[in-house]
Amino acid sequence: MIIDTTEIETINSFSKLESLKEVYGIIWMLFPILTLVLGITIGVLVIVWLEREISAGIQQRIGPEYAGPLGILQALADGTKLLLKENLIPSTGDTRLFSIGPSIAVISIFLSYSVIPFGDHLVLADLSIGVFFWIAISSIAPVGLLMSGYGSNNKYSFLGGLRAAAQSISYEIPLALCVLSISLRVIRLSNSLSTVDIVEAQSKYGFWGWNLWRQPIGFIVFLISSLAECERLPFDLPEAEEELVAGYQTEYSGIKFGLFYIASYLNLLVSSLFVTVLYLGGWNLSIPYIFVPELFGINKRGKVFGTLIGIFITLAKTYLFLFIPIATRWTLPRLRMDQLLNLGWKFLLPISLGNLLLTTSSQLLSL
């Protein structure tokens, strides 16, 4: 049987095209993920620089100024130093738990960014249960901290891990109830818990349509609970230096210690982004009764300009809000453990339940 050479060449060209399609498909799938990871990394570096500059201003001292212009590269210098340090492992600890703990903490927080809309439908995964996906994923991070504390075989580390788990449980419930209070109205309008739908529900009435004005009590409870979830002062009991040396981080060094450092700022950034999405109107400019398309002529200039404006507005709101947790770290004293638990269970939980009851009643009366 004789096969024409042209037929063989045609078959080979088709096979090459199919393989190229598969390669381009993989690249097209990975490109948004890599872009998001790169953006998050740059965002964390900016937060570290902002915190150092703001803390220097509060304490009336000079902040970082030698590593790059205005000290902007100081975080990169610190990261390089941690990469070059020796990675020590306790000889009497559980090596597996000790090594897995930091990775669980970082990966769980990274997954939370997948449901955050940075612009009009500019979201990696627009899930119908987006906000509760974030709550479910964020509850995994304390498990990694507890594993790190237990695997270190150190009493200070173990106490720090236990404190992290207790603190997360205490403040996760009020935070979830505040999110549920916001979601009730969105469910009635669009039958969805998508973060995109939550932002669009706030865009109909401009500045006064923000959930900040509809849910002022929930906003305050959410703010306090998110600070506790981020383990920021005055809620940094799991790693209190005067009591526990460094808490669950005591036995860590090198890149694993750096992962905890990154995780704390990743958690701070994702909490501020969710405050922007849930309470501050997301990517909408929210000048009263003037929306972004009318103000900037986005419909005339194309979708790219509108997307860039949406990203800029979201990040501007986020970084303006970040001043609150950064300032509280350097101005408020640390709570005791009993005060922290009493605040969560005896005050924030009843207040969030009452807020949910009021929201439910108002929704039923408006039907």
Curated annotation (Swiss-Prot):
Q: Which UniProt keywords apply?
A: Chloroplast, Membrane, NAD, NADP, Plastid, Plastoquinone, Quinone, Thylakoid, Translocase, Transmembrane, Transmembrane helix
- GO CC: one term? chloroplast thylakoid membrane
Extract the InterPro entries matched here: NADH_UbQ_OxRdtase_su1/FPO, NADH_UbQ_OxRdtase_su1_CS
Entry EC number(s)? 7.1.1.-
Subcellular location per UniProt equals: Plastid, Chloroplast thylakoid membrane
Q: Tell me its family.
A: Belongs to the complex I subunit 1 family.
Purpose: NDH shuttles electrons from NAD(P)H:plastoquinone, via FMN and iron-sulfur (Fe-S) centers, to quinones in the photosynthetic chain and possibly in a chloroplast respiratory chain. The immediate electron acceptor for the enzyme in this species is believed to be plastoquinone. Couples the redox reaction to proton translocation, and thus conserves the redox energy in a proton gradient.
Which PANTHER family does UniProt cross-reference here? NADH DEHYDROGENASE SUBUNIT 1, NADH-UBIQUINONE OXIDOREDUCTASE CHAIN 1
Give the protein's recorded name: NAD(P)H-quinone oxidoreductase subunit 1, chloroplastic
What species is this protein from?
Nicotiana tabacum (Common tobacco)
Query: Gene name?
Result: ndhA
